[in-house]
Amino acid sequence: MADHSASGAPALSTNIESGKFDEKAAEAAAYQPKPKVEDDEDEDIDALIEDLESHDGHDAEEEEEEATPGGGRVVPEDMLQTDTRVGLTSEEVVQRRRKYGLNQMKEEKENHFLKFLGFFVGPIQFVMEGAAVLAAGLEDWVDFGVICGLLLLNAVVGFVQEFQAGSIVDELKKTLALKAVVLRDGTLKEIEAPEVVPGDILQVEEGTIIPADGRIVTDDAFLQVDQSALTGESLAVDKHKGDQVFASSAVKRGEAFVVITATGDNTFVGRAAALVNAASGGSGHFTEVLNGIGTILLILVIFTLLIVWVSSFYRSNPIVQILEFTLAITIIGVPVGLPAVVTTTMAVGAAYLAKKKAIVQKLSAIESLAGVEILCSDKTGTLTKNKLSLHDPYTVAGVDPEDLMLTACLAASRKKKGIDAIDKAFLKSLKYYPRAKSVLSKYKVLQFHPFDPVSKKVVAVVESPQGERITCVKGAPLFVLKTVEEDHPIPEEVDQAYKNKVAEFATRGFRSLGVARKRGEGSWEILGIMPCMDPPRHDTYKTVCEAKTLGLSIKMLTGDAVGIARETSRQLGLGTNIYNAERLGLGGGGDMPGSEVYDFVEAADGFAEVFPQHKYNVVEILQQRGYLVAMTGDGVNDAPSLKKADTGIAVEGSSDAARSAADIVFLAPGLGAIIDALKTSRQIFHRMYAYVVYRIALSIHLEIFLGLWIAILNRSLNIELVVFIAIFADVATLAIAYDNAPYSQTPVKWNLPKLWGMSVLLGVVLAVGTWITVTTMYAQGENGGIVQNFGNMDEVLFLQISLTENWLIFITRANGPFWSSIPSWQLSGAIFLVDILATCFTIWGWFEHSDTSIVAVVRIWIFSFGIFCIMGGVYYILQDSVGFDNLMHGKSPKGNQKQRSLEDFVVSLQRVSTQHEKSQ
C-alpha cells in the first residue's frame, strides 16, 4: 500500500490559498476505500475536461482548429484553391461535387432484369430448359407449359426472397458507412465519405480509413499509415507534411490535416481498379458446392439415359416413346429448385442476423461462421466491460498518493474527442483525490503524445503554476520503470518492491499503470503504480460455458500482462494456460521446433502481451492445422488478422479499418452476441444441408426406379405426373428457409462424401419402397393385385412417390429422431397441402381418367409411413456414425509425420526471414 513517509521525491505543487481547503474532510475523502466506479456513472467528466481545456489553452486551440486547421497549421494557398480559414464553403462543395461527382467508385447499377435471368443459368437449369425444348419437340404443350412454369416459379421465388432480404441488410449496412471529418464553413463536420470533394480539408487520426487521395498539410505532422492493401508493404509507412496519402489506407498512429487531391475513380485505387468491394454479396463455397452437385447429377442423368436408350433400341421402341422416356428421366434427374432454395435460405438468414445486430458483409460468411471451431477473441470489450475502475494505488516511499494521481492525470488527454477509457477512469476517480483535482487545471499542457503501442507509454510535457517544466509519463509499469532506469540506477529495494507489486496486482487480475515524472532537466522519478480493472461482462462466464457445449474453443489474445490475462481467463472459465506471445519464437528467436510451436498454439488457452503480428501468426498456425478460425477485433492493427481468419468479426465500436476487413460486423456488445450469431448461422447451414441431402436423394430415387422400370418392364409414369412430382418436391420445401431448424452442437461444414453417401442410401430406400409398390400391383393372387381392384397404377405410384419424398425433409431437417424437432408451421403447412393435392390427384384420377379407391389411398399412406420410418432409422443411425464418415472419406492415419516435418520447415523459414529483415 501507499507509503506516506516524508522522505522521497518532492511533491508537485498542490498548495491552495489559506482558508480555502478543509484538510480533515479531504483526508477522509482521499483515504477512504475507493469503490469501483459504476458503469453508467459519467459524473461531470465532460465539464471537468472543458474546464481543463479552458485553463491550458486547448479550448482556444480547438476553436482555432475550427478556423485554421491545427491551430496555426495553415494550409498553403498555392497548394489548394481553398479558403484556409474556413475550408470549403457550402457553395464550393456543391460546385465541386457537380464537377467531380461523389467520392465513390463508379459502379454499374445492378440490372434487376439480368439478375432475374441469372436464376435461369446453371447446370441444373440448363437440363430443365433442355427438357422444355424436348417437350415442345414432342408437341406436349401441357408439359412444356408446366416445365416453363416450374423454372419461372423458382426464379421468381429466389429473386423476390433475395431482393427482400438484401434490402433489410442494405438498410442496416448504411450505419456502417465510412465517415470523414472535414473543415467546412469554418467548422469541423462529420460527413459520409462519399460526400468528400477535391479541396476538402480532412482531419485524420488513429483508426481512420482515408476516404480519398490527399496530401498532408499539417506542419509538424507525423503519421504511420498502413498501405498494405495497396502496396503489399507489411509495415506502416511514416508520413510527414507534403507526403501523399491514398484512399483505403488506414492511419495507425498520429493525427493531421490532409487536403483532398483526388476522389472516386481519379484516386490511385480507382485508376488501378484494385479496390475490392468487401461488402459484396459473394456466395462463396456453397455456390461451388451447388455447381458440383448439379454437374454430378447431370452425369448420373446421362448415365441413366444411356441405359434407357440401349434398352429401348434393343426393343425397337418408337422414337416418340424413347423421347418421352428421355423427357421423364431429364425432369426427375435434376432438382431445378435447388439453387433458388439454397440462395433464398442464405438471404433470409442474413436478414435475420441483421435484425439481431450482426451485419453480414457477404453471404459466404454465414457458411464459414457455422463451421468455426476456434474463436480467437480479444479481451477488452468482448470478454470484459471495457469500463475501467481504479483501486488503491501503490506509491514508492515518500510519494503522496495525491501527487501520484495528479501526475497520472496530467499525462491524460484533455480533448473530449480524444479521451480514452483509461484517461476517463483517472478523471472519474479524481473525486477521491480533492487536492489533485483542485490544482489540475492550474497546469498547462505544452505537449501531449498519446499512447504508443510500441513504447507502451503516454507522455505529456506540462508547465506548473510556478512556471516549472515537468514531463509526466504513464504506461505499462515495466516500460515506465525502464525509462527511469535508463536515466539513472534505481535502488535495489525500490526496484524489487516495484516489480513485486506489479506481479501481485497481476495475480489479482489488475491492470497496472506505472507513473513517473521528470522536473525540468532533472532526473526521472518513479512515483508508483495505479491498479485498475476491466471487470468481466456479467454474461461472459455463462456464454463461455455455452460456447464449450457448442464445440467452440475460445482462445484469448490480449496485450495485457500474462498475470492479468491468466486471472481474467480463470474467472471466465477459459482455462489458465495463458502464455507470453514471445514464447512462440516467431520474431526471429526461439528454438522450439516448428511442429511443437503448432502443438503449443493448439493447446494454449490464450496469449498475452500480443502484438498484431502475433495475432496473425496464431490464426495462420491454427488454420494450417486444419481448423476453421474466427477472429474478433476492433482496431486498425487487427485488420490483417481479421482478413486472414476464415471469419473476421468486427465487434461493437470497431474502427473503420476493422469493419472494412471483417466478414461480419456486430452492432451489439459482448461475446453473447457472437455466440448467438454462431448458433443462428448453424441453423441456416443446417437448413441448406438438410435440403441438399433431401433433394439429391429424390433425384437418385427416381433415376433408379424409372431407369430400372423402363429398362426391365419398358414402362414409365405418365409424363404429366412426373412433372407434378418435380413441382411438388420443390413447392413443398420452399418454406425450408423459414423452418425452426435445430442447430448443431458441433461446428458444421460441407461434408460432401458423407452427404453423397447418405443421399444415395436414402434414394435407394425410396427406390426399393416404390419398387415394392409396383410388384404388389403385378401380383396374381385371389384379388389380382391392387391395380385390378382398386385403381390406376400410375396414380397409385404417383401418390406413393409424392408422400415418401415429401416426408423425407422431416428426417433430414432433424439432428436426432424426426420427432425430436418440431418443424415450422410454414414447412408443415406447405407439405400438408401438397400431400392433400397429391391425394386428390389419385382419388379423382387427374391426367389418367381413372379413379382410385379410398382403400388403396389409405393403404398407400400407411405403406409410405412405413418407408418413412425405415428412412428415419437409417438416417438416425448413420448421421453420427464415425465409421460411416470414415468409410465415405476413405480416411487413413498415414501422413501425420509428413505434416509435422512440413511445420518444422515453415517455422524455421519464418524465423530466418524475420532475422534477415531485422539485420537490414
Curated annotation (Swiss-Prot):
Residues 139-140, 315-321, 714-720, 780-806, 848-853 are extracellular. CDD domains: P-type_ATPase_H. Keywords: ATP-binding, Cell membrane, Hydrogen ion transport, Ion transport, Magnesium, Membrane, Metal-binding, Nucleotide-binding, Phosphoprotein, Translocase, Transmembrane, Transmembrane helix, Transport. Its main location: membrane. Residues 1-115, 161-291, 355-687, 739-754, 879-920 are cytoplasmic. InterPro entries: ATPase_P-typ_cation-transptr_N, ATPase_P-typ_cyto_dom_N, ATPase_P-typ_P_site, ATPase_P-typ_TM_dom_sf, ATPase_P-typ_transduc_dom_A_sf, HAD-like_sf, HAD_sf, P-type_ATPase_IIIA. Its EC number is 7.1.2.1. It catalyses: ATP + H2O + H(+)(in) = ADP + phosphate + 2 H(+)(out). The keyword Kinase does not apply. It is an enzyme of class 7 (translocase). It is found in: Cell membrane. The active site is at D378 (4-aspartylphosphate intermediate). GO terms for molecular function: ATP binding; ATP hydrolysis activity; metal ion binding; P-type proton-exporting transporter activity. Residues 38-51 have a biased composition (Acidic residues). Belongs to the cation transport ATPase (P-type) (TC 3.A.3) family. Type IIIA subfamily. The plasma membrane ATPase of plants and fungi is a hydrogen ion pump. The proton gradient it generates drives the active transport of nutrients by H(+)-symport. The resulting external acidification and/or internal alkinization may mediate growth responses. This is Plasma membrane ATPase.
